[in-house]
Amino acid sequence: MHNDLKEVLLTEEDIQNICKELGAQLTKDYQGKPLVCVGILKGSAMFMSDLIKRIDTHLSIDFMDVSSYHGGTESTGEVQIIKDLGSSIENKDVLIIEDILETGTTLKSITELLQSRKVNSLEIVTLLDKPNRRKADIEAKYVGKKIPDEFVVGYGLDYRELYRNLPYIGTLKPEVYSN
């Protein structure tokens, strides 16, 4: 599995430092507010778990499972909601927790849906951002790290459901995903 990687972009320590920094900022920004953290499954599960431990304010969590990849390395642009939220977010401050922001088409669809539910506020935190890939008019307020336009795996990010369990983030060798 490790031999399939070209290089490591973020070590375990790098990721934990990012979580600490983002957690401190989110604690400051959401102190005393009715915060609901919405994790986008499956990719954000590890990031969300580490991040919310560092947000020192009352919060609740919920999840959405949304897909626009359908097994490949490129977003199809067609967003399918597999699992919607389990509770109401009306009059709450909502923080979408995402693993990676690339084209933005999936996140744009999610934000439009959630904004229609009469939230107080809606922001996005993403561990990774690939601004060069953006197609939709959307940005994350909180960004862990901007990365180059390479296919990354690990720490929740997958290729065909594999590599999610890596404790770091790396780039796959092109021959692994071009077959």
UniProtKB/Swiss-Prot annotation:
GO molecular function per UniProt: guanine phosphoribosyltransferase activity; hypoxanthine phosphoribosyltransferase activity; magnesium ion binding; nucleotide binding
Keywords: Cytoplasm, Glycosyltransferase, Magnesium, Metal-binding, Nucleotide-binding, Purine salvage, Transferase
Cofactor(s) required, per the database record: Mg(2+)
GO CC terms of this entry: cytosol
Subcellular location per the Swiss-Prot or TrEMBL entry: Cytoplasm
Binding-site residues for diphosphate, renumbered to this chain: K42, G43, R164
GO biological process: GMP salvage; guanine salvage; hypoxanthine metabolic process; IMP salvage; purine ribonucleoside salvage
Identification of the protein by name: Hypoxanthine-guanine phosphoribosyltransferase
Organism for this UniProt entry: Staphylococcus aureus (strain Mu50 / ATCC 700699)
Taxonomic placement: Bacteria, Bacillati, Bacillota, Bacilli, Bacillales
